[in-house]
Structure formats: structure tokens, C-alpha cells
């Protein structure tokens, strides 16, 4: 029983590695937004909604990884 519990915790820990990718993706999105707005401030209204969409898509992958880790801990 202890071996199964340890395997669940190890699997949940490994599945949270995807959160690292989400964090890097969000950083890249907003770095590109800052770079674009600093080059041409008049495009702020055009670039900001695209940045929010990129943020949402990057964050969704992180939330899926977090959901899998919770499923491994509590449901399996």
C-alpha cells in the first residue's frame, strides 16, 4: 500500500513539470507584448487582446497539468 501511495505522489510531482512550460510561455507572451508596444505604442489596442489570448492558452496547459496531478493524488 505504501508503494502505491509513493508512486501516486511521484507521478503527481512529475506531472507538475508542465507548469514550468506554462510559466515560460506566459513570460514569452508578455515579453513580446512589451517589446511590441515599446517599438510602436499606437499598436497597444491591437496587441493587448492577442497577448491575453496567448496568456490564456499558455495558462490552460498549466491548468491541465495541475488537474492531472490532483487526479493522480485524489482519484486514483
UniProtKB/Swiss-Prot annotation:
Q: Does the keyword Signal apply?
A: no
Name this protein carries in UniProt: ATP synthase subunit 9, mitochondrial
Positions bearing the site annotation: Reversibly protonated during proton transport: 59
| Disulfide partners | none
What family is it from?
A: Belongs to the ATPase C chain family.
Keywords attached to this entry: CF(0), Hydrogen ion transport, Ion transport, Lipid-binding, Membrane, Mitochondrion, Transmembrane, Transmembrane helix, Transport
**InterPro entries attached to this UniProt entry:** ATP_synth_F0_csu (IPR000454), ATP_synth_F0_csu_DDCD_BS (IPR020537), ATP_synth_F0_csu_sf (IPR038662), ATPase_proteolipid_c-like_dom (IPR002379), F/V-ATP_Csub_sf (IPR035921)
Q: What is said about its interaction partners and assembly? A: F-type ATPases have 2 components, CF(1) - the catalytic core - and CF(0) - the membrane proton channel. CF(1) has five subunits: alpha(3), beta(3), gamma(1), delta(1), epsilon(1). CF(0) has three main subunits: a, b and c.
Q: Which residues cross the membrane?
A: 14-34, 52-72
Compartments annotated for it: namely:
Mitochondrion membrane
Q: Which Gene3D superfamilies match?
A: F1F0 ATP synthase subunit C
State the organism's lineage.
Eukaryota, Fungi, Dikarya, Ascomycota, Saccharomycotina
Q: What is the role of this chain?
A: Mitochondrial membrane ATP synthase (F(1)F(0) ATP synthase or Complex V) produces ATP from ADP in the presence of a proton gradient across the membrane which is generated by electron transport complexes of the respiratory chain. F-type ATPases consist of two structural domains, F(1) - containing the extramembraneous catalytic core and F(0) - containing the membrane proton channel, linked together by a central stalk and a peripheral stalk. During catalysis, ATP synthesis in the catalytic domain of F(1) is coupled via a rotary mechanism of the central stalk subunits to proton translocation.
Q: Which GO terms describe its biological process?
A: proton motive force-driven ATP synthesis
Task: Extract the PANTHER family matched here.
Answer: ATP SYNTHASE LIPID-BINDING PROTEIN, MITOCHONDRIAL, ATPASE PROTEIN 9
Indicate how the chain sits in the lipid bilayer: Multi-pass membrane protein
**Gene Ontology terms, cellular component aspect?**
mitochondrial membrane; proton-transporting ATP synthase complex; proton-transporting two-sector ATPase complex, proton-transporting domain
As one GO molecular function, the record gives: lipid binding
| Keyword presence, Ion transport | yes
Amino acid at each position: 500500500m505504501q508503494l502505491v501511495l509513493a508512486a501516486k505522489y511521484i507521478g503527481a510531482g512529475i506531472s507538475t513539470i508542465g507548469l514550468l512550460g506554462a510559466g515560460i510561455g506566459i513570460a514569452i507572451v508578455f515579453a513580446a507584448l512589451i517589446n511590441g508596444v515599446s517599438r510602436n505604442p499606437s499598436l497597444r489596442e491591437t496587441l493587448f487582446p492577442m497577448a491575453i489570448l496567448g496568456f490564456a492558452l499558455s495558462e490552460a496547459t498549466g491548468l491541465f497539468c495541475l488537474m492531472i496531478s490532483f487526479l493522480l493524488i485524489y482519484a486514483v
